[in-house]
Amino acid sequence: MKNLFTLPLAALFFLFTAFTLKQDTPSQKLASVDVKGLDGKIINTGTFSNGGKPIVVSFWATWCAPCKKELNEIAEVYEEWQKETGVKVIAVSIDDARNSTKVKPYVEQQEWTYEIYLDENQDFKRSMNVNNVPHTFVLDGNLNVTWQTNVYNPNGGVEAIYSEVKKAAATTAAPAPENK
């Protein structure tokens, strides 16, 4: 009899908690700060675009094993993701100036086809409230953050990212309601 009341009560609690958390999550746009490309050119993150399609921004570092594992897993399915959703992945290294020379050789060795940027002074990291890496954001086509995670989960984490990419793609692709 006790279980008869406990289960519905627990379900109600989790539903209420999930609704409350979703409701209280503030909307966040992509910050606009300068970062450096691997070619040394400065670019403002506010100019990131993908033709109205989703963008994944992944903060990582060469010394972060979970970051590299996550980005390598994404690399294995990136072409498929692009075909299905048009997503663009942008990997932002937070290696400081002393270590940033390791980024380009590592990226070339891994043959990542992502856009790679250096956030040597960590302005972008701070403006996006990134406290640890890996920290991955999913943005809709309007550069609004729709989802984020700051952990690497080797058991389904990349699939969770892609699930959110598909949601962002569907939301962005949905036609705007007509005003009559």
Each model region followed by its residue ranges:
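N-terminal targeting signals for export/organelle localization
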Residues: 1-36, 147-149, 156, 171-180
